[in-house]
Amino acid sequence: MTTLKNRFSIKWPVFLWVLIISGMLSACATPTPTITPTSSPTMILETETEEATQTPTALITPTATQADLGNLGNPITLGFILTPDETGAIEAAEEIAVLIGEDTGYAVESSIYPDFQSLAIAAQNGAVQLFWLKPLEYIYLNWEGAAQVVLVTNHLGVYAYGVQFIANIDRGFRSYFDPETNQSTGEVNQALQQFSGTRPCFINSSSIPGYFVPLGLLENASTPTLDPVFTQSYNATIRALFIQGICDFGVTYALNGDPLNDIDIVQNLPEAQDQIEVIWQSEGIIPNINLSASPNLPANIEFNIQEAVLDLPLNPVGLSLLSTALKEEIEAVKTVEDTFYNQLRIAILPLDLDLEAITHNSSTP
C-alpha cells in the first residue's frame, strides 16, 4: 500500500504540468479560418450578356403572289391622254373601261395621262397595257418596241385621211385630179414636180397634213421649194392663194372633208371655190387615232379586249363615249395591222424627223 501511494504521488504533479502546457499551446495557436464558397459573378454576367445579345430567329413571311392580269388585284389599264380639267372626257374614259370589263369579265381601269410624254414613259415601263395614240405617237412608240396597233377609229367617214395640193388656176399648174371620182390621175412625180422652185403655203411646223406629209411627198418627188409661208389655218391658206402674191401653192387635208367647202369660205369668199383647184390628192395615208397594246400583253387578253372594243358601237352609248373620251367624232372602229402605217412612214422618211421631240412637245395632230 505504502509503495502504490508513493508512486501515484510522484506521477500526479507531472500530469498536471502536461495539461497546463498543452492548454497554453492551444491558446497561442492561430485559429483555422472557415472556408466559405465563393460566388462567380463573372460567369453570371457572361451568361446574362450572352443571353441578352442573342439574335432572335427571323420569322419567314410568305411573299404575296401577284394576281393574274385582269383580276381585281391586277387590273388591265386603258390609257387616255387627257388634262385634269377635261372632266367629261375622263368620266367617259372610265365608263368605257367599265363596259369593256363587263364584256370581257376582266378588271379594267382607265388610266389618265396629262400628256403624251407621261403616257410614253408608262408604256415603255410596262405600266399601262392599252392606250389610244395619234399616228406619229404610234410610229414613235412602235419604233421603241412599246406599242402594237390593235384597232383604228373611223372619223368623218374614213379610217385614214390624205392631203391635197391646191393652187389658183391663174397660176397655170396642170391638175392631176378628177373631181368626179375624187381621185388623182397620172404620176405623183409629174404632178408635184411642177412646184419645183415655187413657194408653198403650209399650216405650221408641227402639222401632219399641213406640213410633214406634203413636205415629205415633195422630197420623195425630188421637188425643192422656196421657204414656206406658215398661214396657221387652212382657210388662211385658201385666202392667200386667192389673193396671190403670198405663195404659189398650198396644202390641206383631204378625204375627211374639203376646206373649200368650209362655211367661212362659202359665205365670205365664194369665188374661191371656182378659182382654187386641186392639183393632186393623196390616198388615205394618215391613220386616225388608234388603240395600241403593249407587246407584253398576252395574246388572249389582247384579243378579248379587241373584241370588246369592236362591240362598243353596238352599245347605245358606246360611240358617244368614245367620241367624248377621244375628243373627236368616232363613227366606227376596225382592226388593222402595223402595215397600215407604212405609207405614212414612207412619206415622212426623207425628213429624218426627231419623233421623240415632235411627239413630246407638240399637241398639233
Region locations from a protein language model:
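An extracytoplasmic/periplasmic, membrane-proximal ligand-sensing/linker region
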Residues: 70-76, 84-95, 297-365
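A conserved helix-loop-strand patch within extracytoplasmic ligand-binding domains
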Residues: 153-211, 216-221
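Extracytoplasmic small-molecule ligand-binding "clamshell" domains
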Residues: 66-139
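Periplasmic-binding protein-like
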Residues: 77, 81, 155-164, 228, ...
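A ligand-binding cleft/hinge motif common to bilobed small-molecule-binding domains
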Residues: 132-145, 215-220, 243, 248-273
